[in-house]
């Protein structure tokens, strides 16, 4: 009876020992960049790999094969990817890709690379000579497949639970979570509509991404239409916004807005590419943009109190971005006509911050263009986030003209400016914890009826604290805020006027103080604000 158990123990030990071998330490890789002049890097050399302590490092190579001529594209270090585990040689196995890619483990293992497509024919099985089977042989041949299969299942489950998706793949479980999240958002009930399954069509070409490995790293946000990932594109971080297929219309709308002539601006989110990934029912639609590590203005204000100069910088660059978005530019930098665009979901969550706190406008999924001689497209009235909806939107009494939509954006800007002031330490008084507009009045999840009662019927607005008005700059800014969220839409300021006012207020205050606390109320009148004739 001991022989079977001894054989089983021997077999299991050999399997475990085999799994412990093969992991080669990767410290350095061969480096090469065919686009070194354009990207301002070295052309070739050695690259030292750096990563997290519990992550594995690899080397990779990518190349083209044009009629038998090998054209090297990239070589270097590659992050933790289970497709590269225990590969001592750099071998590409795809049949006929546009760009070949291989990865391996071990120092300088990418010095040599090769293409070896997986064989399509049946495997050749070794048949031992017909001998009388012994008990040990029967046990070995019976338990070997079972043990190997068990190890594979356990390893696959562990990888699924602990590893990030490799290049070109997305965790479907995460995507379904995004879809469920999108259906529960604080917005209009009709903002999440399933669409019939159909191919969204080819996205515009994105050669920048097509030639470079893209690796998803972690989910940074869940929004109206899906998830936003932090990803790595070679040595740069990018943001990847992933839409499920039923939100194809939002993906197409945002892609079209980004593709509009003149959309390259320092205060608008930089667009990199739009792509379709997957097939059949697992199709995903990707928007790839610049990544900003400080995140949204909402997140930043939750964790940080800001100075007077920081407030002015964010407010000025934010209003500059919205002013440019609203502007109609007949001939923009040789790109063609840039039409006026209304954002329609302006809020602090959709304002991102660069490292120097320069504001960048994002999320153009609900934006609408106003081109001469063309209908503006879907101008459904009640869209956006409820608590930022203007009174006329809550009432359903919108004039479907360009200026009406721009004034709706300006009401929301007034609320975002209030959020900035509420977290500024310039005034001589306490700085409260961060709160969303109307959170103090009607909580974190207001209904449409509650907002109609507070905003439309009672004409209430977020509270302006008395001690804010004792600082000359904040007092003038509060006047500007009140003129942005005016109940009369036609009386609201334009984004360009807000930008000019903030600049003027900052210069006037900083001309006499250096971000210090000023308590003279009379000094508020020292600077004349721009007249309301500057409104839209």
From Swiss-Prot:
UniProt keyword annotation of Nucleotide-binding present: yes
TM spans (from-to): 138-158
Pfam families in the cross-refs: Activin_recp (PF01064), Pkinase (PF00069)
Post-translational modification: Phosphorylated. Constitutive phosphorylation is in part catalyzed by its own kinase activity.
Residue ranges, Extracellular side: 19-137
Main subcellular location: membrane
Keywords: ATP-binding, Cell membrane, Disulfide bond, Glycoprotein, Kinase, Magnesium, Manganese, Membrane, Metal-binding, Nucleotide-binding, Phosphoprotein, Receptor, Serine/threonine-protein kinase, Signal, Transferase, Transmembrane, Transmembrane helix
Active site: 345 (proton acceptor)
Bilayer topology annotation: Single-pass type I membrane protein
Cytoplasmic face of the membrane: 159-536
Residues carrying covalently attached carbohydrate according to the record: 42, 65
A single GO molecular function term of this UniProt record: protein serine/threonine kinase activity
Annotated EC: 2.7.11.30
Protein name from the UniProt record: Activin receptor type-2B
Record organism: Mus musculus (Mouse)
Lineage: Eukaryota, Metazoa, Chordata, Craniata, Vertebrata
């Amino acid at each position: 009876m001991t022989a079977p158990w001894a054989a089983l123990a021997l077999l299991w030990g050999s399997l475990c020992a085999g799994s412990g071998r093969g992991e080669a330490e990767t410290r350095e890789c061969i480096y090469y960049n065919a686009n070194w002049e354009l990207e301002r890097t070295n052309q070739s050399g050695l690259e030292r790999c750096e990563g997290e302590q519990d992550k594995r490092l690899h080397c990779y190579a990518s190349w083209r094969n044009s009629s038998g001529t090998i054209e090297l594209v990239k070589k270097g270090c590659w992050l933790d990817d289970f497709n590269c585990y225990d590969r001592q040689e750099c071998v590409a196995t795809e049949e006929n890709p546009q760009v070949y890619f291989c990865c391996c483990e071990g120092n300088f293992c990418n010095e040599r690379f090769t293409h070896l497509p997986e064989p399509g024919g049946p495997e050749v099985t070794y048949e031992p000579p017909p001998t009388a089977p012994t008990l040990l042989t029967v046990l070995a041949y019976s338990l070997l497949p079972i043990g190997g299969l068990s190890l594979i299942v356990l390893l696959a489950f562990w990888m699924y639970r602990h590893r990030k998706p490799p290049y070109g793949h997305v965790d479907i479980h995460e995507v379904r979570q995004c879809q469920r999240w999108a259906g529960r958002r604080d917005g209009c009930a009709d903002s999440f509509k399933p669409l019939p399954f159909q191919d969204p069509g080819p996205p515009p070409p994105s050669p920048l991404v097509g030639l470079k490995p893209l690796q998803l790293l972690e989910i940074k946000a869940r929004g109206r239409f899906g998830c936003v990932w932090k990803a790595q594109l070679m040595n740069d971080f990018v943001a990847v916004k992933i839409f499920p297929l039923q939100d194809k219309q939002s993906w197409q709308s945002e892609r079209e807005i980004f593709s509009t002539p003149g959309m390259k601006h320092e205060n608008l989110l930089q667009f990199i590419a739009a792509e379709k990934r997957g097939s059949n029912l697992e199709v995903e639609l990707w928007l790839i943009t610049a990544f900003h590590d400080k995140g949204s203005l909402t997140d930043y204000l939750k964790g940080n109190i800001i100075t007077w100069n920081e407030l002015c910088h964010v407010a000025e660059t934010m209003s500059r971005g919205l002013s440019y978005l609203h502007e109609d530019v007949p001939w923009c930098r040789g790109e063609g006509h840039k039409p006026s665009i209304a954002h329609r979901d302006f809020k602090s969550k959709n304002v991102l911050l660069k490292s120097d706190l320069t504001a960048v406008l994002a999320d153009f999924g609900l934006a609408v263009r106003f081109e001469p001689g063309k209908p503006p497209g879907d101008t459904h009235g009640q869209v956006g986030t409820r608590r930022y909806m203007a009174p006329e939107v809550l009432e359903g009494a919108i004039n479907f003209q360009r200026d009406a939509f721009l004034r709706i954006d300006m009401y929301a800007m007034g609320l975002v400016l209030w959020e900035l002031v509420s977290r500024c330490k310039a005034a001589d008084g306490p700085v409260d914890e961060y709160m969303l507009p109307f959170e103090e009045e009607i909580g974190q999840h207001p209904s449409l009826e509650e907002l109609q009662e507070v905003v439309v019927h009672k004409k209430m607005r977020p509270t302006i604290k008395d001690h804010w008005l004792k600082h000359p700059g904040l007092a003038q800014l509060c006047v500007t805020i009140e003129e942005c969220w005016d109940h009369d839409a036609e009386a609201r300021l334009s984004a360009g006027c807000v930008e000019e006012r903030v600049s003027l207020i900052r210069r006037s205050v900083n001309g006499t103080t250096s971000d210090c606390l000023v308590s003279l109320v009379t000094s508020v009148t020292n600077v004349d604000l721009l007249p309301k004739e500057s409104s839209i």
